Swiss-Prot record:
Spans traversing the lipid bilayer: 33-53, 77-98, 113-133, 178-198, 226-246, 288-308, 320-340, 347-367
Lineage start: Eukaryota, Metazoa, Chordata, Craniata, Vertebrata
One cellular component term from this protein's GO annotations in UniProt: mitochondrial inner membrane
Name of the protein in question: Cytochrome b
Gene expressing this chain: MT-CYB
Binding positions (heme b b562): 83, 182
Miscellaneous remark of the record: Heme 1 (or BL or b562) is low-potential and absorbs at about 562 nm, and heme 2 (or BH or b566) is high-potential and absorbs at about 566 nm.
Similarity-based family: Belongs to the cytochrome b family.
UniProt-recorded Gene Ontology molecular function terms: metal ion binding; ubiquinol-cytochrome-c reductase activity
Cofactor note as given: Binds 2 heme b groups non-covalently.
Organism field: Pongo abelii
Functional note: Component of the ubiquinol-cytochrome c reductase complex (complex III or cytochrome b-c1 complex) that is part of the mitochondrial respiratory chain. The b-c1 complex mediates electron transfer from ubiquinol to cytochrome c. Contributes to the generation of a proton gradient across the mitochondrial membrane that is then used for ATP synthesis.
InterPro entries: Cyt_b/b6_C, Cyt_b/b6_C_sf, Cyt_b/b6_N, Cytb/b6-like_sf, Cytochrome_b, Cytochrome_b_C_euk/bac, Cytochrome_b_N_euk/bac, Di-haem_cyt_TM
Superkingdom of origin: Eukaryota
Length: 380
């Protein structure tokens, strides 16, 4: 008799996605981050739901409602810090997941890659809005600075900013709409994740060698479910260590001060996971140019499949491309460090050099190195 999981319409869907899914036998731990991102999303939605039960999205009460959650709600301090540090872990997994896609050439699955980029944008937007909700100094000024970038758009910029703010400055209407969107977007992210998986399962997973693996597949369960559970346990160990031993390690002390429109913090900066893009924004002296560079720093990912000149999919056997890949990673780390520094010499110069190197590496050096490698292997 055929198993229920193979006949029941709902079970069949789960079976084809998580149990009998044919998976390459040689995928490494770098393929764990997809499931970890799913775990992050579940953690964020769950903790966020409990926080929303006690949060008040109004400029006069938001800050005190956060204090109330931390002090008076049972395990409120833990739920709050799990949510804040969960966002940091989410972005660590996200960056590693994208990095793996770049290294092993997973971007050749176009629909999966492009939905992934939309997911990245949506997650960044959700995280930014979440950062505004505690209504501390950095929340308020971060919201003011970043939303103000819309004013760089010709003709409609100023009207657009006032429309987003719901007034002539960041105030209660801004906070209310940001809370509404911050609550709603994770469910859109969940829907996009389902699409991402749907398109991935159309083509099947890539593997470290970058070659077709149709002749050598194994079932997802039990082999990769066990592997993913191990990854999940290590992830939870890191998250709980961060949350319980050093909950404020990645947050800004200024956010423990109530938002004050009359007092500007000495150094306005976003959360650490946006610092690389913030550094690129600040490295351009012109406002519109900076906004365009900021958008392009993420949108450049859409050009990667078109810039892929190599005859090999993966970088496993391409030492020249590997060198440029790690140069790009080092460059992004420098940009992240610079984004947290004040706007003064020598940081301005470093950020301009690092930003130029970022775009040059992706647009020119990597395609050129691929062509050189093809020529060296006489694959031209």
């Amino acid at each position: 008799m055929t198993s229920t999981r193979k006949t029941n319409p709902l079970m069949k869907l789960i079976n084809h996605s998580l149990i009998d899914l044919p998976t390459p036998s040689n995928i490494s731990a770098w393929w764990n981050f997809g499931s970890l991102l799913g775990a992050c999303l579940i953690i964020q939605i769950t903790t966020g739901l409990f926080l929303a039960m006690h949060y008040s999205p109004d400029a006069s009460t938001a800050f005190s409602s956060i204090a109330h959650i931390t002090r008076d709600v049972n395990y409120g301090w833990m739920i709050r810090h799990l949510h804040a540090n969960g966002a940091s872990m989410f972005f660590i997994c996200l960056f590693l997941h994208i990095g793996r896609g770049l290294y092993y050439g997973s971007f050749t699955h176009l629909e999966t890659w492009n939905i992934g980029i939309i997911l990245l944008f949506t997650t960044m937007m959700t995280a930014f809005m979440g950062y505004v909700l505690p209504w501390g100094q950095m929340s308020f000024w971060g919201a003011t600075v970043i939303t103000n970038l819309l004013s760089a758009i010709p003709y409609i910029g100023t009207d657009l900013v006032q429309w987003v703010w719901g007034g002539y400055s960041v105030n209660s209407p801004t906070l209310t709409r940001f809370f509404t969107l911050h609550f709603m977007l994770p469910f859109i992210i969940t829907a996009l994740t389902t699409l991402h998986l749907l398109f991935l399962h159309e083509t099947g997973s890539n593997n470290p060698l970058g070659i077709p693996s149709h002749s050598d597949k194994i079932t997802f369960h039990p082999y990769y479910t066990i592997k993913d559970i191990l990854g999940l346990l290590l992830f939870l160990l890191a998250l709980m260590t961060l949350t319980l031993l050093s909950p404020d390690l990645l947050s800004d002390p200024d956010n423990y001060t109530l938002a004050n429109p009359l007092s500007t913090p000495p150094h306005i900066k976003p959360e650490w996971y946006f610092l690389f893009a913030y550094a690129i924004l600040r490295s351009v002296p012109n406002k519109l140019g900076g906004v365009m560079a900021l958008m392009l720093s993420i949108l450049i990912l859409t050009t990667i499949p078109a810039l892929h000149m190599s005859k090999q999919q993966s970088m496993t056997f391409r030492p020249l491309s590997q060198f440029l890949y790690w140069l790009l990673i080092a460059d992004l780390l420098i940009l992240t460090w610079i984004g947290g520094q004040p706007v003064s010499y020598p940081f301005i110069t470093i950020s301009q050099v690092a930003s130029t190197l970022y775009f040059t590496t992706i647009l020119l050096l990597m395609p050129a190195s691929s062509l050189i490698e093809n020529h060296m292997l006489k694959w031209t």
